[in-house]
């Protein structure tokens, strides 16, 4: 979803936290029997803790778990698993927000952190060590967006319609994309995301 007139990207994180609280509460209230059949453990959510990307990379993954990353700008699946274990053990949470991802790894529309432009006002949400969401604050200033496109090697002329919005005024806004099938897969303990989709799609299956 996308939402306008935000104060900062934490508004988006708070909205997702509220949505997940509602979803998990509804599942426990309305579908307890079905969840028992599948031996699903529905997490209790009060608040979702968060940690900055570089703190997670250096303090948790490298120092605490002695894991040597191959990429300092992103996480590999094993690093996400490490963070999931750490969040459960140290913070008693199945969920963990990781914020301030490097600008080089985020799309052209992601707002850089004014305090440190090498990083962004963005986040991923991990659920039991699996990324289920990416989101953040979007750029809403025309000149800033054009500059970011050029920095990413894109031609602003090819995005004329997109940029018109910012020319005539756009509010501070943000949004996220959530993998509901990933969430369902991990919640129910499935091994493959196709098991959590009614009509799975891949390069060999496009119909129905």
Where are these regions (language model features)?
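Composition- and surface-driven signal marking solvent-exposed, interaction-prone regions
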Residues: 13-17, 110-111, 137-138, 197-199
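Metal-assisted phosphate- and nucleotidyl-transfer catalytic regions
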Residues: 18-128, 151-164, 168-169
